[in-house]
């Protein structure tokens, strides 16, 4: 990317010089992207009617698989040319001139040790419900659903890792005492009750009300995919910037970028998080599921044989639904908390 604004990377200001490139800021392309996700599923339900009861129960068994090899930062590398090396100290300069001199001010690329790191997850659901016609005017529907979301597993030793926020270590799957599920636990409190009531007060008036709870897997990466195989030691997001002042460069085009530094995995499978220089992906342990509680009450009045009026109150409450944000902030617009090394369990910032 060639740009005119200050800093190691151009911010694409159009005030000075040409702006062009193939990186995240100009015409972003996650290329090449290898993505294959599928799911095997078996579902069945049974119904039994006796008296004024209609009972249903069933099961939904799923097995999900995912392979994702991303290139958000191109695997051949993204070169950045800012105006600084051709500036007069902190003013002036031209990104295109920096490019002509071959002075690279920033560099990013994705480096993978495996292009076959896959994730698997079992999801099992069971339910039972009863529609009970109590009287000719009163009907009650009640039921319970239970959902099993197992922690995802990785297909091979060292093909995935998750950052444990409680320890500061990346749990590397299949290494040492770390299991293929990275020693993650599942949420056992996944009961989903449902109840609904309909009562006919008068021949032309009916009151209805209900409540239900449901769970979800969230956005891609919340509890499955797009996390474990996007961490070290599988994926390294290499980033190099100029550190020698306004007129310095990270390297020249003639030199080329340095090779990424290999990250050895300790024999116990606990890889210390490399610090703020690496954006490691984490999940709560045990898994935390997005939850929705919903309720409603309504009154339906028949006005004529062909016209009715319904007044309703509908409410819902979502819990743990935030898809992307720093867990360390009270305000989503604040920056993340910086933890000094002396207070870190790993001794790192």
Region locations from a protein language model:
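Short acidic-glycine motifs
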Residues: 1-349
């Amino acid at each position: 990317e060639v740009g005119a604004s200050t800093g190691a990377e151009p911010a694409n200001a159009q005030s000075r010089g040409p702006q062009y490139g193939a990186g995240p800021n100009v015409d972003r392309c996650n290329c090449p992207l290898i993505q294959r996700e599928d799911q095997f599923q078996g579902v069945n339900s049974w119904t039994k009617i006796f008296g004024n009861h209609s009972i249903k129960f069933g099961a939904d068994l799923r097995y999900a698989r995912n392979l994702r090899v991303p290139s958000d930062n191109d695997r051949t590398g993204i070169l950045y040319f800012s105006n600084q090396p051709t500036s007069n100290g902190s003013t002036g300069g031209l990104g295109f001139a920096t490019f002509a001199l071959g002075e690279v001010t920033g560099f990013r690329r994705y480096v993978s040790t495996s292009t076959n790191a896959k994730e698997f997850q079992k999801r099992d659901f069971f339910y039972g419900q009863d529609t009970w016609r109590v009287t000719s005017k009163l009907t009650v529907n009640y039921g319970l659903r239970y959902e099993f979301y197992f922690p995802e597993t990785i297909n091979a030793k060292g093909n995935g890792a998750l950052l444990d926020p409680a320890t500061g270590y990346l749990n590397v799957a299949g290494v040492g005492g770390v299991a293929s599920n990275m020693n993650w636990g599942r949420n056992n409190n996944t009961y989903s009750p449902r109840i609904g009531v309909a009562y006919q007060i008068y021949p032309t008036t009916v009151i209805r009300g209900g409540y239900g709870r449901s769970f979800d897997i969230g956005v891609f990466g919340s509890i499955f995919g797009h996390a474990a195989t996007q961490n070290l030691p599988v994926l390294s997001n290499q980033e190099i910037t100029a550190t020698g002042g306004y007129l310095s460069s990270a390297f020249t085009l003639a030199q080329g970028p340095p090779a990424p530094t290999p990250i050895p995995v300790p024999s116990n499978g606990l890889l210390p998080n490399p610090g703020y220089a690496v954006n490691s992906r984490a999940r709560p342990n045990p898994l935390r599921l997005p939850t929705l509680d919903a309720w409603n009450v309504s009154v339906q009045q028949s006005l004529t044989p062909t016209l009715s009026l319904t007044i309703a109150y509908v409410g819902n409450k979502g819990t743990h639904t935030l898809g992307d944000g720093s867990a360390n902030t009270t305000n989503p617009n604040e920056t993340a908390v910086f933890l000094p090394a002396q207070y870190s369990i790993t001794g790192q910032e």
